[in-house]
UniProtKB/Swiss-Prot annotation:
The presence of a 'disulfide through disulfide knot' structurally defines this protein as a knottin. It comes from the Eukaryota. Pfam families: Toxin_29. GO terms for molecular function: toxin activity. This is U13-ctenitoxin-Pn1c. It is found in: Secreted. The lineage of its organism: Eukaryota, Metazoa, Ecdysozoa, Arthropoda, Chelicerata. One of its GO terms (cellular component) is extracellular region. Keywords: Disulfide bond, Knottin, Neurotoxin, Secreted, Toxin.
Length: 33
């Protein structure tokens, strides 16, 4: 399973390497860590 880094767009299930999938700039991106 691949994951997305901070600043990359994510899906509602939140496949982020670290941090969480949050709404920003009218889209979902990975933020935090």
């Amino acid at each position: 399973v691949f994951c997305r880094f901070n600043g990359q767009q994510c899906t509602s299930d939140g496949q982020c390497c670290y941090g969480k999938c949050r709404t920003a700039f009218l889209r979902m991106i990975c933020m935090g860590g």
